[in-house]
């Protein structure tokens, strides 16, 4: 090993000319060497969360349809309808909350406390949605057996 007098800073920049330093390697697609636009990053993150929220919303709507098709004779009819309804309402609330989070300017320090609260609220609501959906899965939603029986 070379025991030269060069100093390297942990997680710091590489000296010019060193392989991997910004001036030695060309910029790759998707990589930038400037600061990150925080508003753009937050908007992308909220858009991704919204898409996942929509997917879960569609899955819960499908589960609600299956439970309603089975009717009140299904053993867990009432608990599942209540849990799925709670999940749907919370998901709509989180979706609206994410829209508000995207609209705020993250560069304004006066709004940081409010944004932090709203972000923590959204995270807490998502956690509650996950727990509710675990219970929905535990009770089980099956398609009606009438659809599987041959018609004569």
Swiss-Prot record:
Tissue: Widely expressed in both adult and embryonic tissues, primarily those of epithelial origin.
Ranges where the record places region Helix alpha2: 58-74
Modified residues (N-acetylmethionine): 1
Protein name: Ninjurin-1
Effect in UniProt of substituting residue 100 to V: In mutant M5(cyto); decreased ability to mediate plasma membrane rupture
Extracellular face of the membrane: 1-78, 139-152
Substitution effect: residue 53 to A: Strongly reduced ability to homooligomerize and mediate plasma membrane rupture (cytolysis)
UniProt-annotated site: Cleavage, residues: 56-57
Region (Helix alpha1): 44-55
Transmembrane segment boundaries: 79-103, 114-138
Location of region: N-terminal adhesion motif: 26-37
Recorded consequence of changing residue 125 to W: Strongly reduced ability to mediate plasma membrane rupture
Primary gene name: NINJ1
Effect of residue 111 to E: Strongly reduced ability to mediate plasma membrane rupture
Record keyword Transmembrane helix present: yes
UniProt cross-references to Pfam families, sorted A to Z: Ninjurin (PF04923)
Mutation effect (residue 121 to A): In mutant M5(cyto); decreased ability to mediate plasma membrane rupture
Region (Disordered), start-end ranges: 1-26
Phosphoserine: residues bearing it: 21, 25
Induction of the gene: By nerve injury both in dorsal root ganglion neurons and in Schwann cells.
């Amino acid at each position: 090993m070379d025991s030269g007098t060069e100093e390297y800073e942990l997680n710091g920049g590489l000296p010019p000319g060193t392989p991997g330093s910004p001036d030695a390697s060309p910029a790759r697609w998707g990589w930038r060497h400037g600061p990150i636009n925080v508003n753009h990053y937050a908007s992308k993150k909220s858009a991704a969360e919204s898409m996942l929220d929509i997917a879960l919303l569609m899955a819960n709507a499908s589960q609600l349809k299956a439970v309603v098709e089975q009717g009140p004779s299904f053993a867990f009819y009432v608990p599942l309808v209540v849990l799925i309804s709670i999940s749907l309402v919370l998901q709509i609330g989180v979706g609206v909350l994410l829209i508000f989070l995207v609209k705020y300017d993250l560069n304004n320090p006066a709004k940081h406390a409010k944004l932090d609260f709203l972000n923590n609220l959204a995270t807490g609501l998502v956690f509650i949605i996950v727990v509710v959906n675990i219970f929905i899965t535990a009770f089980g939603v099956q398609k009606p057996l009438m659809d599987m029986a041959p018609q004569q």
